[in-house]
Regions:
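Nucleotide-activated chemistry modules centered on ATP-dependent adenylation/adenylyltransferase
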Residues: 1-309
Length: 309
């Protein structure tokens, strides 16, 4: 890694300013969307994917947060999950780890087994089976991450008319074109009894690097260093060509699980041959809505499309 040309004093001044601003965003969110509405803070939760950027967010707010939360998608690299657990333990930060519901796992989705349980569409297959491409990312996000966060909220908010939970997310404006649209809405957004706060909206990658220089105790996730993504979700919707081979080089057990699932999907006959291959989309389709927690995959997808343009 090349040495920084910025002086330690300049780094320290910049990070002090950014840190104060980030905490001010959280203060504003609590004041405007909790206290002003005569609600109580049920929890301040860091959404911790295990990536190096989310680790910086977690380090920044670990002394103010009541919990960290991790969506165990069931289709990710176990080393990242363990990294999240170990990091939270070392900081004394309670971790809430949530999983997909039984019968609605990633495996169930790609095998076409997930059906609506309630409402007018009860019994209807929600996903026909096969692996997702970019246009189907939103379905995977809803099932593997969004519902996990709903469980976190429900754990902490006992009375939504009196309490609100604050989710701290690591969304940044410079990550990608689509996620910049999310950031343009502002760093604070209330959705029902959940207040979403993105304190790093205006941070750049250089700022994140500077934070680590000022705070050398911030840990690193080996998975992120090797794959340039956290690896907590390998749904494959935003996978690039050759990604599974890259995963196999460093984490062969994970790649073997995905390849075994490919064979299972192929044998089931639920999907056309093209969709029996993990990561088949590789930028072929226009992506659908982007999830609040899908930062690294989304940014990498944009970068790869830019290279191909």
């Amino acid at each position: 890694m090349a040495a920084s040309l910025v002086s330690p004093a300049a780094d320290a001044a910049r990070i002090a300013e950014l840190t104060a601003s980030a905490h001010a965003v959280l203060d504003e969110a609590i004041e405007k969307h909790v206290l002003a509405d005569k609600r109580r803070v049920a929890g301040i939760v860091i959404l911790f994917s295990g990536g190096n950027d989310s680790t910086t967010l977690a380090h920044l707010f670990k002394d103010r947060a009541t919990h960290a939360a991790h969506a165990n998608t069931g289709i990710g690299i176990e080393q990242t999950r363990q990294y999240v657990r170990d990091t939270c333990t070392s900081w004394g930060l309670p971790l809430i780890e949530k999983y997909p519901e039984e019968g609605a796992t990633y495996r169930d989705l790609v095998l076409g087994r997930v059906r609506a349980r309630t409402g007018a569409n009860a019994g209807t297959v929600l996903w026909p089976g096969g692996f997702p491409g970019p246009a189907s990312h939103w379905m995977m996000y809803q099932r593997l991450k969004e519902r996990a966060l709903e469980k976190v909220r429900n754990d902490l908010v006992s009375n939504p008319y009196r309490e609100r939970v604050v989710f701290l997310a690591g969304r940044r404006a410079d990550e990608s074109g689509r996620r910049k649209g999310l950031a343009d809405r502002g760093p604070i957004e209330r959705r029902g009894s959940t207040v979403w706060v993105s304190p790093l909206t205006n941070w750049t990658k250089l700022d994140l690097n500077a934070y680590r220089r000022v705070h050398p105790d911030v840990p690193r996730n080996e998975v992120s260093d090797l794959l340039h993504m956290s690896g907590e979700c390998l749904c494959g919707a935003f996978a690039h060509s050759g990604e599974l081979d890259e995963i196999a080089e460093w984490f062969p057990e994970t790649a073997a699980e995905i390849r075994a699932l490919e064979e299972e999907v192929r044998a089931s006959g639920v999907a056309p041959p093209e969709r029996c291959k993990w990561g088949w989309g590789a930028g072929k389709q226009r992506p659908s809505r982007v999830g609040d927690l899908c930062s690294s995959c989304d940014a990498r997808f944009d970068a790869l499309r830019g290279e191909a343009a």
